Amino acid sequence: MHLLVVSQYFWPEDFRVNDLVSGLENRGHKVTVLTGLPNYPSGLLDIDFIKNPSKYRKYNNVDIIRVPIILRGSNKIKLLLNYVSFALSASTIGVYKLRKLNFDLIFVFEPSPITVGLPAILLRKIKKVPVIFWALDLWPDTLNAIGIVKSKFILNLIGGLVSFIYNRCDLILGQSKSFLPHIQKYSNHSNIKYFPGWAESVFSDIKDENSLPHNKKSFDIIFTGNIGDAQDFPSVLNAIELLKADSNIHWTIVGNGRLLSWLENEIVIRNLIGSVTLAGRHPINKMPYFFNKAD
């Protein structure tokens, strides 16, 4: 089968879709990926991509079709423009670049935003092939939960967009069983299935590495991942402040994101330098070592 994977994020960005695509290719499928420009999580264009963009036209034997987008930047307006720009660019430039290709199936990877489904359902109509939509984030629920959108009117509009997309997919996959009733609320068909994520193979054999930040005398709390709005770092910092009197507790934050500069400033302002280590971004194969240090 020739499969088209539509994802706003793809290698060199670290997302599970990379493993999914490799797995599909290893099973003998021909895979093409429609994606944007790598700028997650920093909001800046990937340095290696800038130096050698031709290197990122292929992922093993997988063809990568990239479309121009507005970069995520460091504020909510730029993030919104980033979301909209991919949907528009993939629905126009992306569709044009794919005009001579035929597919048997379209697979959508949606960690956020929901708008990644728009170019997919347009291509569904043009190519006359089914769409599978893997929902890893729940819109509009997530927007409301993290306070990005509070207006009921706007949330209802977004809910209408979610229904529009869901109802034009042939199969919807939810990464958690608790997702399924939420998805059903915005869909008029019952073809909704549970499809969980998985751990990368590097986590099967965790080894020690003494070069990583670690204080054997402390109780180590470690966070790894994106440093953004959804992670609610104001609450994390409040917790660190409450516990900073206990010198045996140490926090390590591994990752990068739009709010990294803000986090660095807040740590200084709140006098938390002795309680927190910002370890920066590390490749996935280093993550098991950090997890091994966590209490």
Locate predicted features.
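Carbohydrate-associated surface elements
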Residues: 37, 178, 195-198, 281
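Acidic donor-binding loop of glycosyltransferase active sites
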Residues: 170, 275, 291-295
